[in-house]
Structure formats: structure tokens, C-alpha cells
């Protein structure tokens, strides 16, 4: 498969810069195999589910993972010895004091450089600023930052000095503000660790969750900490050559047992978002049994993949040539998704993290 197979024209004004208010008033496109697409709103979701269905959410919580600061001057002097403004997006925690991050400008950074994030008048290690050393440097602007703080103290420092890591297509249009601290977080988020929101979940309100439970739909929570790699474009012309960044996920024994029981009783597994789906697929064997999982996953789903768990997927509208558009094409069929996206663009649906949503029923013929 070629990357161009997943391209389409998306007008720039279709990318939402703010979420719908209230959250569940966003538009909702229902896509069933062999049927015409249907326009609804997210609050209609209970109408498409049955008692006994199991809804699976990702309860990760977004941390303010975008840090701005200065690379301190080097003793060598010269142009490279002067301080340089830098920006880091934390990607994955490696140790109590270490994070993998994407950092720019990458060409101005070397192993051993000191970086001061936040205020620049504090002492090293003081919460007045956040200090780190570049311990490793890799391709694509990825570095390992060794902070002077560790554990809970580092968490506090990041919370004080970091900004919410809005996706590039939104950040290019406007800066992060205080509204995003609430808007870019699901109402059920509880496990700190993501640098991007599981955006399908942003549409849920406490009232909608109660209506789902009243319908007899069970609610289950798994955790996948979404990394900054979710923002990276595919750079290979041949799709199979692309490599995903690993992300940590967890499915408990209790959740695995509950999902297996729901399926055995005839209920459908409904994944809220691609992160929930990717994690469940990683935790499920070829026999279709969900098992406890606590590990990293770099699963990359493209057309031809045989799904083991999910029957229905709720997901936002994704960007051209993205790994997520490849995933939904694998789930609901490439031609069906092209037709659905053409309809969405023509009728004014809003795309991407703060945009509208869709409900996809799996096409078993894919």
C-alpha cells in the first residue's frame, strides 16, 4: 500500500479550533456496512447501542507536556555557545527523573547541553525553574532529558511550567490557553501520563454516561498513555515501512474478564477512540480472548488487518495520510471511509481533535 492511497483534500477551515459546547452536541456520523451514512449528534449514541454492550474508554489523563525554555550557553563560546530558545514535547517517561521528548531546534542541541525550562532566575533544582541535561540524542529530534528533579517533585515542576500539548494543526492557528486545560481532557480522565488526548472521549458528559448505564450498557476503563508520536506524519511512501512509536498501556484482569463475559453473553465491544481499540487488540490473542496487559505497544493497523475484539468504533475525523485514517479504513472499509469523509467534508463536519465524531460498525468483509 502506498501513502498516497490514504490522501484526500481537506479544506483548512474544516479543522476545529475549539470543541462543541456542550461536549455531546457535536455532530455524529453513523457508518454501517452497505448502508447510507446517517447524520446525528453525539448525544444520540445510546440509540445505537443495546443492553449488554460493553463500552471501552481510555482513562488516561493529559499532562502539560510542552515545555519552553533556554539551552544554556556552552563554555566553547562562539555562535553555538550562546543561549538558544528551545521547545520540548515530552513523549514517554523512562525513569523517575527521565523523559523521552521531541525537541527543537534539534540541530542546535548536543548531548550534555543543559536546558532551563520556565523561569530563569531560580537555582538549579529549585521549583522556580525546571532544569535538565540532554542525556541522549536520536533521529527525528528525539532526545532523552535527565531532569534535576525526580518523581513527584518532577511532576509538580512539569505541571507548573508546562503547557497543554495541543496538536500542531491547532497550535499553528492559536496558542494554548486556560480553556484548553479543561477542554483537552475527558471528564473521566484519572491516570496521568498522556501528551495527547484520546479525543473521541472528549465528547462525553456525565449526563451521557448516566444515560448509557441506564440503557444497560456497561462502562469499562483501560489506560493507554498517548505519546507525541501520534502527531508525527508518515514519511515513507510505502506504508509498511512506517514504524510507530511505542506507548504504555494497561488492561487489568478485572476488565479483561468483564469484556470476555460481555462478549460470551452476546454483547458487542464498542471502543471509544482508536487508543482503546489499539490497546485491546494488543491485549487479545488470536483466539479472541482478552488477557491482562501491562506493557508497551507499537501496533500499526492498516487495511487487511483482522480485528479480534472491537465490533463498533467511535472516533473523530482524522487527517489525510495519517495512521489513524489507515486504521479506520481497515475497520470499516477503505471505500466506505472515503465516501463517509467526502460526505463529512461536503456537509461541514469539523475535523481532528476538537472536531466532530463518527460511529463505525465493523465491516467483516474487509
From Swiss-Prot:
Q: How does it assemble?
A: Monomer.
Per the record, what are the reactions this protein catalyses?
7-aminomethyl-7-carbaguanosine(34) in tRNA + S-adenosyl-L-methionine = epoxyqueuosine(34) in tRNA + adenine + L-methionine + 2 H(+)
Q: Where in the cell is it found?
A: Cytoplasm
Cellular component (GO) terms are: cytoplasm
Query: Where does the source fall among the domains of life?
Result: Bacteria
GO terms (molecular function) for this protein are: S-adenosylmethionine:tRNA ribosyltransferase-isomerase activity
Predominant place of localization:
cytoplasm
One matching Pfam family:
Queuosine_synth
Which key words are in the record? Answer: Cytoplasm, Queuosine biosynthesis, S-adenosyl-L-methionine, Transferase
The Gene Ontology biological process annotation of the record reads:
queuosine biosynthetic process; tRNA wobble guanine modification
* Protein name per Swiss-Prot or TrEMBL: S-adenosylmethionine:tRNA ribosyltransferase-isomerase
Q: Which family does it belong to?
A: Belongs to the QueA family.
Entry EC number(s): 2.4.99.17
Q: What does the record give as its pathway?
A: tRNA modification; tRNA-queuosine biosynthesis
Q: What does this protein's UniProt record list under function?
A: Transfers and isomerizes the ribose moiety from AdoMet to the 7-aminomethyl group of 7-deazaguanine (preQ1-tRNA) to give epoxyqueuosine (oQ-tRNA).
Amino acid at each position: 500500500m502506498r501513502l498516497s492511497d490514504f490522501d484526500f483534500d481537506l479544506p483548512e477551515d474544516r479543522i476545529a479550533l475549539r470543541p462543541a459546547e456542550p461536549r455531546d452536541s457535536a455532530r455524529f456520523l453513523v457508518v454501517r456496512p452497505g448502508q447510507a451514512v446517517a447524520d446525528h449528534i453525539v448525544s444520540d449514541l445510546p440509540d445505537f447501542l443495546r443492553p449488554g454492550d460493553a463500552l471501552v474508554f481510555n482513562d488516561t489523563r493529559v499532562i502539560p507536556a510542552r515545555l519552553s525554555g533556554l539551552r544554556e550557553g556552552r563554555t566553547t563560546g562562539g555562535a553555538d555557545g550562546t543561549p538558544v530558545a528551545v521547545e520540548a514535547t515530552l513523549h514517554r517517561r523512562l525513569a523517575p527523573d527521565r523523559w523521552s521528548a521531541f525537541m527543537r531546534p534539534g540541530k542546535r542541541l548536543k548531548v550534555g547541553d543543559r536546558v532551563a525550562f520556565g523561569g530563569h532566575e531560580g537555582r538549579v533544582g529549585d521549583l522556580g525553574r525546571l532544569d535538565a541535561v540532554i542525556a541522549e540524542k536520536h533521529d527525528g529530534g528525539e532526545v532523552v532529558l535527565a531532569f534535576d528533579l525526580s518523581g513527584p517533585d518532577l511532576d509538580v515542576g512539569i505541571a507548573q511550567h508546562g503547557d497543554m500539548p495541543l496538536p500542531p494543526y491547532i497550535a499553528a492557528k492559536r496558542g494554548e490557553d486556560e480553556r484548553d486545560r479543561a477542554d483537552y481532557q475527558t471528564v473521566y480522565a484519572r491516570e496521568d501520563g498522556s501528551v495527547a488526548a484520546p479525543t473521541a472521549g472528549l465528547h462525553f458528559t456525565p449526563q451521557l454516561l448516566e444515560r448509557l448505564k441506564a440503557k444497560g450498557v456497561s462502562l469499562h476503563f483501560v489506560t493507554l498513555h498517548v505519546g507525541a508520536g501520534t502527531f508525527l506524519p508518515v514519511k515513507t511512501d510505502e506504508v509498511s515501512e512506517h514504524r510507530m512509536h511505542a506507548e504504555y498501556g494497561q488492561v487489568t484482569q478485572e476488565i479483561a474478564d468483564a469484556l470476555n463475559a460481555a462478549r460470551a453473553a452476546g454483547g458487542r465491544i464498542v471502543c471509544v477512540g482508536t487508543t482503546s481499540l489499539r490497546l485491546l487488540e494488543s491485549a487479545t490473542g488470536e483466539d479472541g480472548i482478552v488477557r491482562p496487559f501491562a506493557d508497551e505497544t507499537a501496533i500499526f493497523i492498516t487495511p487487511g488487518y483482522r480485528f479480534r475484539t472491537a465490533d463498533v468504533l467511535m472516533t473523530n475525523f482524522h487527517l489525510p495520510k495519517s495512521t489513524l485514517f489507515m486504521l479506520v479504513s481497515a475497520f470499516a472499509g477503505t471505500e466506505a471511509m472515503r465516501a463517509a469523509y467526502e460526505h463529512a467534508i461536503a456537509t461541514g463536519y469539523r475535523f481532528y481533535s476538537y472536531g466532530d465524531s463518527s460511529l463505525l460498525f465493523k465491516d467483516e468483509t474487509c
